[in-house]
Amino acid sequence: MQDLESLYQMVAARKANPKEGSYTDYLFTKGLDKILKKVGEETTEVIVAAKNEGTAELQYETADLLYHLMVLLVEQGLTYDDIKEELGKREGLMSDFKDRPEIKDL
């Protein structure tokens, strides 16, 4: 079983040591626009899967999204620890949705 941190490390290692023919290398070679397109596609697929019955499709699509998010983080120079740190700052804090009028009525 692979956890998110080891997935991030694998993606970062692939960027540092490209392997010809790998999908990860393909994404890094194509660049940010391709990576963003894939993140958008996978996000949409997660939403659609969540609306469908059962959880197998949602599980599959969520794994795809998490992988592509890790590629995006590596491409943008963010580390897994950066994200853990940000999550740690939020721990125990109550979100004040009044500060976000764009989500108030969702």
From Swiss-Prot:
Gene3D superfamilies: MazG-like (1.10.287.1080). It catalyses: 1-(5-phospho-beta-D-ribosyl)-ATP + H2O = 1-(5-phospho-beta-D-ribosyl)-5'-AMP + diphosphate + H(+). It comes from the Bacteria. It is an enzyme of class 3 (hydrolase). Belongs to the PRA-PH family. HAMAP family: HisE. This is Phosphoribosyl-ATP pyrophosphatase. It comes from Limosilactobacillus fermentum (strain NBRC 3956 / LMG 18251).
